[in-house]
Amino acid sequence: MKSILQQPIWRYYDQSISAKQRSPLESFATDDTLCQLVGQLVSPPTIRTWVHEASVVLGIQDHRLPYVQQGMDLLESRGYQPIVRNSGGLAVVLDEGILNISIVLSEQMDSLSINDGYDVMVDLVKGLFPEVAEKIEAYEIVGSYCPGSYDLSIEGKKFAGISQRRLRQGVAVQIYLCIEGSGSQRAALIRDFYEESLQQEETKFNYPQIVPEVMASLSELVDLHLTVEGVVIRLQQLLHRLAGEVHPESFHDEELTLYGFYLKRVFERNAKMLERHE
Protein backbone atom coordinates (compact mmCIF):
# COMPACT_ATOMS: atom_id res chain seq x y z
CA MET A 1 0.00 0.00 0.00
CA LYS A 2 1.61 3.27 -1.08
CA SER A 3 2.15 5.94 1.55
CA ILE A 4 -0.02 8.44 -0.36
CA LEU A 5 -3.06 6.53 0.92
CA GLN A 6 -1.79 6.87 4.48
CA GLN A 7 -3.02 10.33 5.41
CA PRO A 8 -3.35 11.94 8.86
CA ILE A 9 -6.99 12.70 7.98
CA TRP A 10 -9.27 11.34 5.29
CA ARG A 11 -12.56 13.07 4.70
CA TYR A 12 -15.17 10.52 3.67
CA TYR A 13 -18.28 11.52 1.74
CA ASP A 14 -20.65 8.59 1.26
CA GLN A 15 -23.27 9.05 -1.47
CA SER A 16 -23.69 5.37 -2.26
CA ILE A 17 -27.36 5.67 -1.27
CA SER A 18 -28.17 9.39 -1.38
CA ALA A 19 -27.03 9.93 -5.00
CA LYS A 20 -28.96 7.02 -6.52
CA GLN A 21 -31.95 8.98 -7.78
CA ARG A 22 -29.95 12.06 -8.75
CA SER A 23 -28.41 12.92 -12.11
CA PRO A 24 -24.81 11.79 -12.64
CA LEU A 25 -24.15 15.42 -13.61
CA GLU A 26 -24.54 16.22 -9.91
CA SER A 27 -21.71 13.80 -9.14
CA PHE A 28 -19.43 15.53 -11.64
CA ALA A 29 -20.20 18.86 -9.96
CA THR A 30 -19.49 17.32 -6.55
CA ASP A 31 -16.06 16.09 -7.64
CA ASP A 32 -15.26 19.47 -9.22
CA THR A 33 -16.18 21.13 -5.92
CA LEU A 34 -14.00 18.71 -3.97
CA CYS A 35 -11.14 19.27 -6.42
CA GLN A 36 -11.15 22.97 -5.59
CA LEU A 37 -11.62 22.49 -1.84
CA VAL A 38 -8.91 19.85 -1.52
CA GLY A 39 -6.65 21.47 -4.11
CA GLN A 40 -6.70 24.76 -2.21
CA LEU A 41 -6.18 22.92 1.13
CA VAL A 42 -9.57 24.06 2.43
CA SER A 43 -10.54 20.41 2.91
CA PRO A 44 -8.40 17.39 3.80
CA PRO A 45 -7.89 14.67 1.16
CA THR A 46 -11.26 13.13 0.42
CA ILE A 47 -12.71 9.82 -0.67
CA ARG A 48 -16.26 9.79 -2.01
CA THR A 49 -18.46 6.82 -2.83
CA TRP A 50 -21.37 7.23 -5.22
CA VAL A 51 -23.98 5.12 -6.99
CA HIS A 52 -26.54 6.14 -9.62
CA GLU A 53 -29.56 4.44 -11.12
CA ALA A 54 -29.39 3.13 -14.70
CA SER A 55 -27.59 5.74 -16.83
CA VAL A 56 -25.03 5.85 -19.61
CA VAL A 57 -22.53 8.71 -19.51
CA LEU A 58 -21.40 9.74 -22.99
CA GLY A 59 -18.26 11.73 -23.78
CA ILE A 60 -17.68 14.35 -26.48
CA GLN A 61 -16.63 11.79 -29.09
CA ASP A 62 -19.76 9.73 -28.46
CA HIS A 63 -21.88 12.80 -29.00
CA ARG A 64 -20.30 13.21 -32.46
CA LEU A 65 -21.57 9.83 -33.64
CA PRO A 66 -23.53 10.26 -36.90
CA TYR A 67 -26.76 8.76 -35.53
CA VAL A 68 -26.28 9.48 -31.84
CA GLN A 69 -29.94 10.40 -31.30
CA GLN A 70 -31.02 6.94 -32.42
CA GLY A 71 -28.40 5.48 -30.10
CA MET A 72 -29.68 7.54 -27.19
CA ASP A 73 -33.24 6.46 -27.99
CA LEU A 74 -32.07 2.84 -27.84
CA LEU A 75 -30.56 3.41 -24.39
CA GLU A 76 -33.81 4.95 -23.15
CA SER A 77 -35.82 2.03 -24.56
CA ARG A 78 -33.60 -0.30 -22.49
CA GLY A 79 -34.24 1.73 -19.33
CA TYR A 80 -30.97 3.70 -19.27
CA GLN A 81 -30.88 7.50 -19.12
CA PRO A 82 -28.24 8.93 -21.49
CA ILE A 83 -26.14 11.78 -20.08
CA VAL A 84 -23.70 13.83 -22.16
CA ARG A 85 -20.58 15.10 -20.44
CA ASN A 86 -18.39 17.86 -21.86
CA SER A 87 -15.16 15.90 -21.45
CA GLY A 88 -13.00 13.25 -23.00
CA GLY A 89 -13.57 9.59 -22.42
CA LEU A 90 -16.16 7.32 -23.95
CA ALA A 91 -19.47 5.77 -22.93
CA VAL A 92 -19.68 4.11 -19.51
CA VAL A 93 -22.58 2.45 -17.71
CA LEU A 94 -23.82 3.43 -14.27
CA ASP A 95 -26.36 1.40 -12.32
CA GLU A 96 -27.05 0.13 -8.82
CA GLY A 97 -24.56 -2.74 -9.18
CA ILE A 98 -21.69 -0.34 -9.92
CA LEU A 99 -19.83 1.45 -7.15
CA ASN A 100 -17.98 4.62 -8.09
CA ILE A 101 -15.14 5.84 -5.90
CA SER A 102 -13.37 9.20 -6.16
CA ILE A 103 -10.04 9.90 -4.47
CA VAL A 104 -9.44 13.66 -4.29
CA LEU A 105 -5.91 14.90 -3.53
CA SER A 106 -4.10 18.23 -3.57
CA GLU A 107 -1.12 19.08 -5.78
CA GLN A 108 -0.34 22.24 -3.86
CA MET A 109 2.49 20.70 -1.82
CA ASP A 110 3.57 17.86 -4.12
CA SER A 111 2.74 17.31 -7.77
CA LEU A 112 1.04 14.07 -8.72
CA SER A 113 1.79 12.61 -12.14
CA ILE A 114 -0.97 11.06 -14.23
CA ASN A 115 0.43 7.58 -13.65
CA ASP A 116 0.87 8.18 -9.91
CA GLY A 117 -2.79 9.19 -9.73
CA TYR A 118 -3.83 5.96 -11.41
CA ASP A 119 -1.49 3.93 -9.17
CA VAL A 120 -3.11 5.36 -6.03
CA MET A 121 -6.47 4.00 -7.17
CA VAL A 122 -5.01 0.63 -8.13
CA ASP A 123 -3.50 0.37 -4.64
CA LEU A 124 -6.84 1.27 -3.06
CA VAL A 125 -8.67 -1.42 -5.04
CA LYS A 126 -6.08 -4.04 -4.14
CA GLY A 127 -6.46 -2.98 -0.51
CA LEU A 128 -10.23 -3.41 -0.80
CA PHE A 129 -9.93 -6.96 -2.09
CA PRO A 130 -6.84 -8.50 -0.47
CA GLU A 131 -8.20 -11.98 -1.21
CA VAL A 132 -7.60 -11.44 -4.96
CA ALA A 133 -5.12 -8.53 -4.96
CA GLU A 134 -2.40 -10.58 -6.67
CA LYS A 135 -4.76 -11.44 -9.54
CA ILE A 136 -5.75 -7.82 -10.29
CA GLU A 137 -3.91 -6.41 -13.31
CA ALA A 138 -3.86 -2.93 -14.87
CA TYR A 139 -3.61 -2.78 -18.67
CA GLU A 140 -5.91 -1.95 -21.59
CA ILE A 141 -8.59 -4.55 -22.25
CA VAL A 142 -9.28 -4.44 -25.99
CA GLY A 143 -12.96 -5.01 -26.70
CA SER A 144 -14.16 -3.32 -23.51
CA TYR A 145 -16.11 -0.08 -23.38
CA CYS A 146 -14.13 3.08 -22.58
CA PRO A 147 -10.81 1.21 -22.86
CA GLY A 148 -7.72 2.65 -21.18
CA SER A 149 -4.23 1.68 -20.06
CA TYR A 150 -5.41 1.38 -16.45
CA ASP A 151 -8.36 -0.94 -17.02
CA LEU A 152 -8.52 -3.32 -14.06
CA SER A 153 -9.05 -6.98 -14.82
CA ILE A 154 -8.75 -10.49 -13.46
CA GLU A 155 -7.65 -13.17 -15.94
CA GLY A 156 -8.31 -10.82 -18.86
CA LYS A 157 -11.84 -9.82 -17.84
CA LYS A 158 -12.32 -6.13 -17.09
CA PHE A 159 -14.30 -5.12 -14.01
CA ALA A 160 -13.25 -1.48 -13.58
CA GLY A 161 -12.07 1.63 -15.40
CA ILE A 162 -10.23 4.66 -14.03
CA SER A 163 -10.27 8.31 -15.10
CA GLN A 164 -8.88 11.58 -13.74
CA ARG A 165 -10.09 15.14 -13.39
CA ARG A 166 -7.70 18.02 -12.54
CA LEU A 167 -8.94 21.42 -11.37
CA ARG A 168 -7.62 24.25 -9.17
CA GLN A 169 -4.61 22.20 -7.98
CA GLY A 170 -6.89 19.33 -7.06
CA VAL A 171 -6.86 15.86 -8.61
CA ALA A 172 -9.91 13.60 -8.60
CA VAL A 173 -9.11 10.00 -9.53
CA GLN A 174 -12.38 8.24 -10.30
CA ILE A 175 -13.14 4.56 -10.73
CA TYR A 176 -16.25 2.62 -11.63
CA LEU A 177 -16.22 -0.82 -10.00
CA CYS A 178 -18.63 -3.37 -11.45
CA ILE A 179 -19.52 -5.25 -8.28
CA GLU A 180 -22.85 -6.96 -8.99
CA GLY A 181 -24.76 -8.06 -12.08
CA SER A 182 -23.52 -9.05 -15.52
CA GLY A 183 -20.52 -7.21 -16.93
CA SER A 184 -21.06 -8.72 -20.38
CA GLN A 185 -24.71 -7.54 -20.47
CA ARG A 186 -23.57 -3.98 -19.71
CA ALA A 187 -20.98 -4.26 -22.48
CA ALA A 188 -23.60 -5.60 -24.90
CA LEU A 189 -25.74 -2.52 -24.16
CA ILE A 190 -22.86 -0.22 -25.15
CA ARG A 191 -22.09 -2.37 -28.21
CA ASP A 192 -25.70 -1.98 -29.34
CA PHE A 193 -25.52 1.78 -28.68
CA TYR A 194 -22.49 2.13 -30.96
CA GLU A 195 -24.02 -0.05 -33.67
CA GLU A 196 -27.22 2.03 -33.63
CA SER A 197 -25.28 5.32 -33.53
CA LEU A 198 -22.86 4.39 -36.34
CA GLN A 199 -25.08 2.33 -38.66
CA GLN A 200 -21.89 1.18 -40.44
CA GLU A 201 -20.97 4.74 -41.42
CA GLU A 202 -17.23 5.45 -41.51
CA THR A 203 -15.92 8.05 -39.05
CA LYS A 204 -12.54 9.70 -38.48
CA PHE A 205 -12.58 8.61 -34.84
CA ASN A 206 -12.18 4.91 -34.13
CA TYR A 207 -14.93 3.87 -31.75
CA PRO A 208 -14.35 0.72 -29.70
CA GLN A 209 -15.34 -2.60 -31.22
CA ILE A 210 -16.95 -4.08 -28.14
CA VAL A 211 -16.66 -7.76 -27.30
CA PRO A 212 -19.01 -8.26 -24.33
CA GLU A 213 -17.25 -11.42 -23.14
CA VAL A 214 -14.13 -9.47 -22.05
CA MET A 215 -16.09 -7.66 -19.32
CA ALA A 216 -17.43 -9.05 -16.05
CA SER A 217 -18.43 -7.95 -12.57
CA LEU A 218 -16.29 -8.83 -9.57
CA SER A 219 -19.09 -11.09 -8.33
CA GLU A 220 -18.67 -13.13 -11.51
CA LEU A 221 -14.88 -13.26 -11.24
CA VAL A 222 -14.17 -14.10 -7.61
CA ASP A 223 -15.47 -16.65 -5.16
CA LEU A 224 -16.73 -14.01 -2.75
CA HIS A 225 -20.23 -12.81 -1.92
CA LEU A 226 -19.87 -9.17 -2.94
CA THR A 227 -22.47 -6.41 -2.86
CA VAL A 228 -22.12 -2.67 -3.38
CA GLU A 229 -23.15 -2.12 0.24
CA GLY A 230 -20.59 -4.65 1.44
CA VAL A 231 -17.77 -3.04 -0.55
CA VAL A 232 -18.65 0.37 0.94
CA ILE A 233 -18.18 -1.21 4.38
CA ARG A 234 -14.85 -2.69 3.26
CA LEU A 235 -13.76 0.79 2.15
CA GLN A 236 -14.74 2.37 5.46
CA GLN A 237 -12.76 -0.28 7.33
CA LEU A 238 -9.75 0.21 5.04
CA LEU A 239 -9.82 3.99 5.56
CA HIS A 240 -9.73 3.56 9.33
CA ARG A 241 -6.62 1.39 8.92
CA LEU A 242 -4.95 3.91 6.60
CA ALA A 243 -5.73 7.19 8.36
CA GLY A 244 -5.11 8.73 11.74
CA GLU A 245 -8.66 10.07 11.57
CA VAL A 246 -11.62 9.57 9.26
CA HIS A 247 -14.11 12.45 9.09
CA PRO A 248 -17.49 11.47 7.58
CA GLU A 249 -18.64 14.79 6.11
CA SER A 250 -21.03 15.98 3.44
CA PHE A 251 -20.89 19.59 2.23
CA HIS A 252 -21.50 22.33 4.78
CA ASP A 253 -23.07 25.71 3.97
CA GLU A 254 -20.06 27.50 2.46
CA GLU A 255 -19.13 24.45 0.42
CA LEU A 256 -22.70 24.14 -0.84
CA THR A 257 -22.39 27.63 -2.33
CA LEU A 258 -19.34 26.52 -4.31
CA TYR A 259 -21.12 23.30 -5.26
CA GLY A 260 -24.02 25.39 -6.60
CA PHE A 261 -21.56 27.22 -8.88
CA TYR A 262 -20.13 23.99 -10.30
CA LEU A 263 -23.56 22.39 -10.59
CA LYS A 264 -24.85 25.31 -12.67
CA ARG A 265 -21.77 25.11 -14.88
CA VAL A 266 -22.11 21.36 -15.45
CA PHE A 267 -25.80 21.59 -16.36
CA GLU A 268 -25.23 24.60 -18.66
CA ARG A 269 -22.45 22.78 -20.50
CA ASN A 270 -24.61 19.70 -20.85
CA ALA A 271 -27.46 21.80 -22.26
CA LYS A 272 -25.10 23.42 -24.79
CA MET A 273 -23.89 20.01 -25.94
CA LEU A 274 -27.48 18.90 -26.52
CA GLU A 275 -28.31 22.16 -28.34
CA ARG A 276 -25.38 21.68 -30.70
CA HIS A 277 -26.65 18.23 -31.55
CA GLU A 278 -30.16 19.49 -32.31
From Swiss-Prot:
Entry annotated with the keyword Nucleotide-binding: no
Role noted for this protein: Catalyzes the amidotransfer (transamidation) of the octanoyl moiety from octanoyl-GcvH to the lipoyl domain of the E2 subunit of lipoate-dependent enzymes.
CDD domains in UniProt: LplA
Pathway info: Protein modification; protein lipoylation via endogenous pathway; protein N(6)-(lipoyl)lysine from octanoyl-[acyl-carrier-protein]
InterPro entries per UniProt: aa-tRNA-synth_II/BPL/LPL, BPL_LPL_catalytic, LipL, Octanoyltrans_LipM/LipL
Family listed: Belongs to the octanoyltransferase LipL family.
Protein name as annotated: Octanoyl-[GcvH]:protein N-octanoyltransferase
Start and end residues of each BPL/LPL catalytic domain: 41-247
A GO MF label: lipoyl(octanoyl) transferase activity
